[in-house]
């Protein structure tokens, strides 16, 4: 991989907002995936607590631990040469107090070499975001649908409380976050928030007017089985391709066709 590429920085995000240059974000959880995404021009790689659902197989993100995030984020940060790497702070690693959040965020940056952390919440998390940012740790916010609040919400659904969500996004920006994820909100609301804020908005299920977009890697490549959210555009069907390839291998082994002459030593 080339070593002379210019890495994406936090100031780049803010400049791209003013330049109206869209920001492409994808998730990754391991070295080879991050290396592929980085080489493909992704601006930012998010090591999301979504690893709980798409990697570990749980129904929610709530079981993910900070040690697990650190384990995955270290691999991703080591693979990335250009893309900004952001790691999620998982459930109950920051909600107790700003002090707890600072300790967790510090661990993540120090032990993974990623560039920033992401945490969920708006006005109620303003003091927490400020405490982390004041320690020179960049923070990406997350408002709208908050997966870590699934037990209270009851279901993953579009959030329509306009005033509340707009106030949350504004609070995140005023607390010093460098960007904010808008998840599962009406496109008109996302457009208003994007126009109102001086920091980039990164949409997931928030329409086309955000400053950037994020998707889960496994969803957009067709690896995840089962229900696909409305906001996901599937760019490949790797799940079926993997099944076909493995079935071919199993058949070749069973029939004695593998290994053949070209795969054998003399």
Regions found by a protein language model. Give the residues of each.
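Alpha/beta enzyme core
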Residues: 2-230, 236-266
